[in-house]
Every structure is written in structure tokens, then in C-alpha cells.
Amino acid sequence: MEMTETTKRTTKVWAHRGASGYRPENTLEAFELAIRQGADGIELDVHTSVDGELIVMHDENVDRVTDGTGLIKDMTLAQLKELKVSTPAEPSGIYHIPTLAEVLELMRTTDMMVNIELKNSICFYPGMEGKILKLVKEMNMEDQLIYSSFNHYSLLQLKQLNDHVQTGILFSDGWVNPAMYAKNLGINAVHPAVYHLKYPQFIEEVKRAGLKMHVWTANKPELQLVKDAGAEAVITNYPDRAIEIIEK
């Protein structure tokens, strides 16, 4: 399909761990495909290795998506780089775990947003917030970033280090008025799961609080719901399919 200018979309399309419906999640290849498909942004997850490197991967361990085992926090960058990332659809594909610096180097040549989720709710990574902000500043990408986490202490730490950063809360099921909670913390956005949109008054509460809404993970069946809700962004595994629906 021919891609239109992304700035015209009312609801932006962010690629969830890259175009992860087509390439192994959180790999450079997945992010490159998201760029080619015309996404407005990407979402990724960050951990810290034992030698202090910022590593892009969703899980705390490498077991699910690589040919290795173990926790990221216990492995060096060199050990992580030796692993091969694959998917059931591409078991013989040779992909590797990227660092955050490698992904940002790719994204800095675009005008796309980058949503970094700090994965420090199970394994704690002291100093992660400062390392990320330092790297982003060095790459002159501060205007392209938004930070999210289930660990709201981490979001507050980011705000303490730089009050101008954009942040969004991730939250578990059954919260009453998370938008007001986020506003009281000085957070800029809520990042609800797509089914949270069906909670009583949820959408109205977000709008009343004056916050942005970035919804995950919405694929074809749920995209119209997200569009109708007036979300500022949808986070999806299939950016090309999302674009078709959002632009109708």
C-alpha cells in the first residue's frame, strides 16, 4: 500500500516491539520494518545487563525468544550478543538482541516517536533512569521520546531528573480512575490495555483529566474501538494493517 504522511493521522500508529507480527520482537529488523511500513512510532522494552548496558528485550530472561537461558541482569552484553533470536514462524532466522543505543541510532534518522518501557518492576535496575536520559540527550532525541512503566516510582525518578520528559503510566486491571491518579503524579499520559477502554467512564475520565491516551496492544479486531475512543496512539503488532483502518 502507498503510505500517506503520518502527521495527518489523528490516532498515531506505534509498532509494538517493532513490527512484531512480521519479525522477531524487539529486534533491529522489526524496527526497520516498522519504519518501512509507515508507522508513526515504535514501542520497546529496556533492561540492564550485569555490566550496565541498556538491553532491548521484553522479558526479564532470554528463554522465550532466544536459544539461551538466564536473566538479563546476570549476563554481560557479550553473552547476550552471542544469542540468536527467533520466532516459531522463522526458527532458522538469525537475529540478535540489540542495545538501546543501536535502536536509537536507527530511529534518530526519522521523526518517529520512541516509547521506552522501563522493565524494572520485577528486576530492579538502580540508575537505569539516568542512563537512559543521558543516552537520549547524547543522541539529541529528547523530543522523540516518551517513557512508560508499571513501576511508577521509576517514572517519578525520570521526572525528578528531567521535568520536561513525557511519561505514561502502565497499570494492572481493575483500577478506578487511573487518569486522575496519573494527573496527580504529574504524568502526561495513560497507557491502557485495549480492554480497559470498556471500563465504565474510563475514556471520559482520561479526557476530563486532560491526558493523552496510548492504547496497547490493539490488532485488527480492536482498532476501530481505539480509533472511536479518540486515542492519541495505538500500539500494535501490525502497523501496516493498523494504518489501513486508522486512515479509513
What are the functions of these language-model segments?
Residues M1-K248:
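Phosphate-group recognition and catalysis centered on beta-loop-alpha active-site segments
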